[in-house]
């Protein structure tokens, strides 16, 4: 990252404290019970997932957590940092899209957001790994790293059908995980988690062999469990801007990432088999059933071959020790424009090996303090 890990430690602690990260709200859903059962029977790694929730009921309603916590128990950005900002006097403007950063004498001087014009001594960009590089490019920045090195954690899912009802849309969002294959190829392996499988998610992920087959699979939804296979990708994509200035994304799964994903898919199938699934299949366009191993050529990733999901986006305006290596310096500041700081996942120099939420917020916390020090 370009700074000592000891510098980041206090910010990691501050973020975890503000978000209320704990392992006291980890009652496993039926999905997670099956994940844990399969892992334990195989003798593989399994652990409780730390979660940023306070007062979570860990019951039926928690399955909709990804759509917004109905109880307000999830300590999201809205319930933490935005509340803190508002209490400190910040004005929060919604419905206004930043079109470009205003620059004067080589330094950030504000933001053009169409009907809203902001004048400031510094600008912090935190628009995500797609919109951040697009904003920088629209603002006239030309560092060659802007838009490059986009990582996605391009994952997939493996399904298991059980005799008992799983009701996979219910229960704690994610209570268990496994790092059994996390350290493949120097830390570029996969993680296993479960996710609440609502009908809309399943419709996008299930294989298609025709209307009758699809109807049968959807009717079996109460008996299905899904294991998400989330890799750390070495390959990368790119964000450019079109004629209208909007982002255009290209990404091709690297062969080495596809190979590791295959290992992860086989492992997920073994977990489901050990947990007692009587049918196991992938999210490929052609239904691929697992019977002690998929056919060697059955699980190749290519155009129209299977469903992949971009779990976490990062890296498209990465930090580096010089303009040749990164779009911004280790403090997140642009090499081209003073007091223009990137504070989101696009600043990651490589893909993270875990969910990047805490790391994103910790780097933003650290670099916000550095920026404040320069401005005072």
Over which residues does each language-model region extend?
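A glycine-rich dinucleotide-binding beta-alpha-beta segment and adjacent secondary-structure elements
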Residues: 55, 61-67, 99-102, 272, ...
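Glycine-rich loop(s) and the adjacent beta-strand/alpha-helix scaffold that form part
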Residues: 4, 87, 96, 101, ...
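Non-transmembrane alpha-helical segments in soluble domains
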Residues: 9-16, 36, 82, 86, ...
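Glycine- and acidic
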Residues: 18-22, 50, 63-68, 246-255, ...
